[in-house]
Amino acid sequence: MATPLDEKLRALAADEAMKCGLDVEKLTFTRAGAKSSVKIAVDADERPDLDLLEEASQLIGAAFDAAEEAQQIDLGPSYTLEVTTPGLDFPLREARNFQRNIGRLANLPGGGKGRIAAVENDEVAILPAAKKKAGKKSQGKKAGKKTPQAPVQIYPRAELAGSTIEVEFSPAPAAEQELLGLTMAEYHELAKSDEA
């Protein structure tokens, strides 16, 4: 639960991050004796580089220092500020979180996996990940064919809140790549044709 101080810090950080084209995704304040800690995760449509994170950190730090001087906030005798990106384990919640990860494979709530194809209003189009069938062992490795799933599923975004991005070490299967880049209306048509 956010405290009044957390809310003030988030508002200050969001104003400064916006100057760099960044959104504040998460803020954690920890009071630890003489040295407190403020950790802020920021993101943008294009992944921020280290220079942009440094610029945001300087702006946010200056805003915090000015607010402390004006006695609007109290971070304790000293504090450490860490500005970073959310990371792959950050749970997707907002439309912008899903939008920034179109084309990436996600671990969905309930245990499924699917590729984020499109986001519009409060809907997300998901291309279900192909499931591997068991196959013969070949040269010490398990061989298997991927069984295609339904071409697309449309979910209310709220049902997918908490999804996380999965690390992939190879490109998406060709069948999934071919289905990326359609409009939400086209994904709705695909979903309807699959139901028939």
Swiss-Prot record:
Required for maturation of 30S ribosomal subunits. GO terms for biological process: ribosomal small subunit assembly; translation. GO terms for cellular component: cytosol. This is Ribosome maturation factor RimP. Belongs to the RimP family. Its main location: cytoplasm. Residues 131-153 are annotated as: Disordered. The keyword Phosphoprotein does not apply. Residues 131-145 have a biased composition (Basic residues). It is found in: Cytoplasm. It comes from Corynebacterium urealyticum (strain ATCC 43042 / DSM 7109). Keywords: Cytoplasm, Ribosome biogenesis. PANTHER family: RIBOSOME MATURATION FACTOR RIMP (PTHR33867:SF1).
